[in-house]
Curated annotation (Swiss-Prot), chain C:
This is Trafficking protein particle complex subunit 2-like protein. PANTHER family: TRAFFICKING PROTEIN PARTICLE COMPLEX SUBUNIT 2. It comes from Taeniopygia guttata. Pfam families: Sedlin_N (PF04628). Belongs to the TRAPP small subunits family. Sedlin subfamily. Signal peptide: none annotated. The gene is TRAPPC2L.
């Protein structure tokens, strides 16, 4: 059980933050491209999920999984999107994402008057605290060799 | 005979909760009088710096806007409110949750326009203006204009362009403070070029 | 009911004087001014004893043939002086104390007004209303 990486996007598509822990192979394209690809996919998935939903939807797109990993997604009404990739052993990372948003991002980045809103996160404190939090999660373990 | 500061019974405590960053995070209380005095000092310093009531009003609005774009994230994180479906729901959330959370008051919502795109918030008491009396040379000053900026900035971050202004103010002799909010349009997502 | 109420700053200049209008105002101003000496005397007498419970109310400063003058000093050395008609014997000490307490509360409210600079003359409508309620109703 492990956590691969985390992305934070804002509404216009820019990636504000990226951090990885156990990523075995990269995508083979430059990081800018990777962010654009990720955002584009999320956007399409979101609108697809909304259109195809058989009943009224509250949260919309929450997660998807493949045979190798699971992607968890949290979107705030203010347009902030948090994406966490974990391995298949993690059923839901919603609380973790909410904690990262409410207690780390809002407290350390949003409330910092020196961080302009919607700009890439430079805050070292945020990175450290996030790292400490992610490592403290019960499903963060050493990378399973099979994955 | 010892003398009590007789205003102790009236001072309202505002509760600001620290989230659980660490297990020893505690409840922090702040006296609302300190907040009122801080805001008053801010406004009077702006008056001294700008000397012109209109400029002060504009600055307060700008400052409020900067606060609003950040405050909305804190509000969403703490209150867990999802997207509002229409303007009426937005009005309810603003009056019953947001004002209560940040200022400790619950304004009432009245005067809906027939099209449902304008309404008024009536504040019986405004904690920003406790003890304040506007002198005669600042009759056009909108003392609590910061609130207008905050509301405008916060709603802009959730894709609503609104116009917010004071129509009645207890400092100017009216019986209540009334804020009029008008929905202008929805701000659409604009995608970066090359997407879809 | 008071005949004249004055608020004097720490440096002994008046921040606010209001008296019943039909009387000779100058006489009241003079009375208040001379009473300041008595106030200073009382303050210095108290200061030496260093009591742990500083009494803010000074009591009767001195009686003249028509009037009685009462004093009150705050911890920041702002003094309130009240001139009361001698013929009004119904006024007891407790009432005078409560009137001073109201004055003190209104004064602190003025200090909290961000537009008021300490040391300025007092121009507050709320303070005026409160003082008017304490002055004698002269028709």
């Amino acid at each position: 059980m492990t956590i691969h990486n985390l992305y934070i996007f804002e509404r216009g598509g820019r990636c504000l933050f990226y951090s990885e822990w156990h990523r075995r192979r990269g995508p083979g394209i430059p990081q800018e491209e990777e962010f654009k690809l990720m955002f584009g996919m999320l956007f399409s998935l979101r609108s697809f999920v909304a259109k195809m939903s058989p009943t009224d939807m509250r949260d919309g797109f929450v997660a998807f999984h493949t045979s190798k990993y699971r992607l968890h997604y949290l979107e705030t009404p203010s347009g902030l999107r948090l994406v966490l990739n974990t391995d298949l052993g993690v059923p839901s990372a919603r609380e973790a994402l909410q904690h990262i948003y409410g207690n780390l991002f809002v407290e350390l980045v949003v409330k910092n008057p020196l961080c302009p809103p919607r700009a890439p996160v430079q805050s070292l404190l945020f990175r450290q605290r996030l790292d400490a939090f992610v490592r403290s999660l019960p499903y963060f373990g050493p990378r399973n060799p099979q994955n | 005979m010892s003398r009590q500061g007789g205003r102790g019974t009236e001072s309202k405590k505002m509760y600001w909760y620290l989230p659980f960053i660490s297990p020893s995070a505690s409840l922090q209380l702040m006296n609302s009088e300190l907040f009122t005095l801080t805001y008053g000092a801010l406004v009077t310093q702006l008056c001294k710096d700008y000397e012109n009531d209109d400029d002060v009003n504009k600055q307060l609005d700008k400052m409020g806007y900067n606060i609003g774009v950040r405050l909305i994230e804190d509000f969403l994180a703490r209150s867990n409110v999802g997207r509002c479906h229409d303007f009426r729901e937005t009005a309810d959330v603003i009056a019953k949750i947001a004002f209560k959370m940040y200022l400790g008051i619950t304004p009432s919502i009245t005067n809906w326009s027939p099209g449902g795109d304008e309404f008024s918030l009536i504040l019986e008491n405004n904690p920003l203006v406790d003890f304040v009396e506007l002198p005669d040379n600042h009759s056009t000053l909108i003392y609590s204009n910061l609130l207008c900026g905050v509301l405008r900035g916060a709603l802009e971050m959730v894709q609503m362009a609104v116009d917010v202004k004071f129509v009645q103010d207890t400092l100017k002799g009216d019986s209540v403070t009334e804020i009029r909010m008008k929905f202008i349009r929805r701000i659409e997502d604009n995608l970066p070029a090359g997407e879809e | 009911m008071a005949v004249c109420i004055a608020v004097i700053a720490k440096e002994n200049y008046p921040l606010y004087i209001r008296s019943v209008p039909t009387e000779n105002e100058l006489k009241f101003h003079y009375t208040v001014h001379t009473s300041l000496d008595v106030v200073d005397e009382k303050i210095s007498a108290m200061g030496k004893a260093l009591v742990d419970q500083r009494e803010l109310y000074l009591g009767l400063l001195y009686p003249t043939e028509d009037y009685k003058v009462y004093g009150y000093v705050t911890n920041s050395k702002v003094k309130f002086v009240m001139v009361v008609d001698s013929s009004n014997t119904a006024l007891r000490d407790n009432e005078i104390r409560s009137m001073f307490r109201k004055l003190h509360n209104s004064y602190t409210d003025i200090m909290c007004n961000p537009f008021y600079n300490p040391g300025d003359r007092i121009h507050s409508r709320a303070f005026d209303t409160m003082v008017n309620s304490m002055m004698m109703q002269v028709c």
